[in-house]
């Protein structure tokens, strides 16, 4: 056992000593971050997660300690004892400890380090693959340590907040019954039940509802969830969410609790006061103005739906718009203020950008002094009446640029939504990453309960089948499911969905009608959800809840560029762990015990 560990105890971290500590004898533990040998004195910057402290080993004070310090190299793990001394005129303003240094009287090397594959510095140009391969070294870097400490603080604040409000932190199973549909599950074979599989829970949804039916009326959990999906910048196969459920509530009660949490986190972590209540926007308005249900409201540039205008003008001399309307598509425009000076090259780049999302092109018009359109193929055929109507609808002014999309509704929404954000970044309205100092929270409410699956010819739940429909829309469950809106809500921040939830169905008869609207037979419903249907018949209370994505929340709080920067041990976009080599092969004996056989044949 190291002498320093048994005989001495750490007195301070490497980031807390100040001039108030001058004259004190201290014991520090950490890693050698930097080393400078000036002959008669060796200087090191000693690092731990709290910061850096300069330590001096002087030959004329302790020759033996100075000699040992001569062996130090970067990333050696050491213990140091010494006296805190003023740095006089050599203050380092970049360090919290920059007014002092420690003159060492004792040193112990706990462990040596081989040369690291990259520098342990704030900014490095090492590729992500190398950093993930040596993640334990990457995590020694101050930016990642600050991020994970912020994450720990968010965990702590969240637990205290909900506990103070009378919530119980309760656990739910990870290994659950597999049910087809929804997200693709990770499967776990059961050795004791040959041929049977568990699924790793994609969320605690059903179990937290069952807690409500069991009488635990306020539940929360910071929980791991698993989804075997294609990965993106903001996805990981295993992720963490702040999961919440409450009995005897309507959606305003959920909003009140969750806004309180968010306001507390922003105040305690960033020192920022977030005003409440948060803005609310119907789903239909969000789609019309912004093309998606997670709009970034830090800047303006809303879309304008022109479908009715084009219909009223019978196409207005623009055949492609006319055809889109006749085919039950939509026509949208977006006014880009004072941007008529965009060059042809810039416009061409925008057109290539939208084509990459499935658009056939990018119609545009530059607005002149008299409202005329220039540098636009549309200007040749559009009627003056439709042009004037579009200018008025878009509130177009001379010098503005109008951009158009028309065609299939889903494509137009997606293209225009992404184009809006792309232009905002290009124009400097928002930064590429981070908040830019602006925080625009929004509840998107009242979405459709169902969406039509053209492939199967069936209505499917837009989120899940346990969401309560609006009472006024129950009449449409059998006749026109597309008209049924529901008590679902998403919490959006700066263009990211950070949480979503709903008021749940607690009436077994309405639940059965929802299943039938989705084409789910009584037998199928009982096979998949029999336990829940039985519980609904046993005095289930009105209840609702929400889940916030912890990883995404921390990503936004810290200004990180991706979720991989806020997860300690992330997977790559292929779902692999470059450090451990997971996923890996399993020996044949264990597969036989699990009654599993691989049919994969390498190409």
Swiss-Prot record:
It catalyses: tRNA(Asx) + L-aspartate + ATP = L-aspartyl-tRNA(Asx) + AMP + diphosphate. Its EC number is 6.1.1.23. CDD domains: AspRS_core, EcAspRS_like_N. Signal peptide: none annotated. Its main location: cytoplasm. L-aspartate binds at residues 227, 463, 504. PROSITE patterns: AA_TRNA_LIGASE_II. Gene3D superfamilies: Bira Bifunctional Protein, Domain 2, GAD-like domain, Nucleic acid-binding proteins. Homodimer. This is Aspartate--tRNA(Asp/Asn) ligase.
């Amino acid at each position: 056992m190291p002498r320093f560990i048994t005989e001495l105890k750490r007195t301070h971290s490497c980031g807390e000593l100040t001039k108030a500590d001058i004259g004190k004898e201290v014991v520090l533990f950490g890693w050698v971050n930097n080393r400078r040998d000036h002959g008669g004195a060796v200087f090191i910057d000693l690092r731990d997660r709290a910061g850096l402290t300069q330590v001096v080993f002087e030959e004329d004070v302790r020759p033996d300690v100075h000699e040992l310090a001569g062996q130090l190299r970067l990333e050696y793990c050491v213990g140091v004892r010494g006296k805190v001394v003023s740095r006089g005129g050599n203050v380092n303003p970049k360090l919290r400890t920059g007014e002092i240094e420690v003159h060492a009287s004792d040193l112990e090397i706990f462990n040596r380090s081989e040369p690291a594959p990259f520098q342990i510095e704030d900014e490095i140009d090492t590729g992500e693959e190398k950093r993930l391969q040596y993640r334990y070294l990457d995590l020694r870097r101050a930016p990642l340590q600050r991020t994970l400490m912020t994450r720990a603080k968010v965990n702590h604040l969240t637990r205290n907040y909900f506990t103070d409000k009378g919530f119980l932190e309760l656990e739910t199973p990870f290994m659950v019954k597999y049910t087809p549909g929804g997200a693709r599950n990770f499967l776990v074979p059961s050795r004791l039940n040959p041929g049977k599989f568990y699924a790793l829970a994609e969320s605690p949804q059903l179990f937290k509802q069952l807690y409500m039916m069991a009488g635990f009326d306020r539940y929360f959990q910071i929980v791991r969830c698993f989804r075997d999906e294609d990965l993106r910048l903001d996805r990981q196969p295993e992720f963490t969410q702040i999961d919440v459920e409450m009995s005897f509530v309507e959606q305003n009660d959920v909003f009140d609790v969750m806004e309180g949490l968010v306001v507390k986190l922003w105040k305690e972590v960033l020192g920022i006061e977030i005003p409440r209540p948060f803005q609310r926007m119907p789903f239909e308005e969000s789609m019309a103005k912004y093309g998606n249900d997670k709009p970034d409201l830090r800047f303006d540039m809303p879309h304008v739906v022109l479908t009715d205008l084009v219909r009223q003008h019978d196409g207005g001399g623009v055949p492609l718009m006319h055809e889109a309307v006749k085919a039950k598509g939509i026509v949208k425009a977006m006014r880009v203020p004072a941007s008529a000076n965009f060059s042809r090259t810039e416009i061409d780049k925008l057109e290539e950008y939208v084509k990459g999302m499935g658009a056939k092109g990018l119609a545009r018009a530059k607005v002149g002094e008299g409202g005329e359109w220039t540098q636009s193929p549309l200007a040749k055929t559009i009627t003056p009446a439709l042009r004037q109507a579009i200018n008025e609808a878009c509130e177009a002014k001379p010098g503005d640029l109008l951009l158009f999309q028309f065609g299939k509704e889903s494509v137009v929404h997606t293209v225009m939504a992404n184009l809006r954000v792309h232009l905002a970044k290009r124009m400097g309205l928002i930064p590429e990453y981070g908040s830019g100092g602006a925080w625009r929270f929004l509840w998107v409410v009242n979405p459709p309960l169902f969406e039509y699956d053209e492939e199967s010819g069936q209505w499917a739940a837009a989120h899940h089948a346990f969401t309560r429909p609006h009472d006024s829309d129950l009449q449409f469950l059998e006749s026109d499911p597309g008209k049924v809106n529901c008590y679902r809500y998403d919490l959006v921040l700066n263009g990211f969905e950070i949480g979503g939830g709903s008021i749940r169905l607690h009436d077994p008869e309405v639940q059965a009608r929802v299943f039938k609207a989705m084409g789910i037979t009584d037998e199928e419903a009982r096979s998949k959800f029999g336990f829940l249907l039985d519980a609904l018949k046993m005095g289930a209370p009105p209840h609702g809840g929400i889940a916030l994505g912890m990883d995404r929340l921390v990503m936004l709080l810290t200004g990180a560029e991706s979720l991989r920067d806020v997860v300690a041990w992330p997977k790559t976009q292929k779902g692999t762990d470059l450090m451990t080599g997971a996923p890996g092969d399993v020996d044949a004996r264990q597969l036989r015990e699990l009654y599993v056989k691989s049919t994969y044949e390498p190409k």
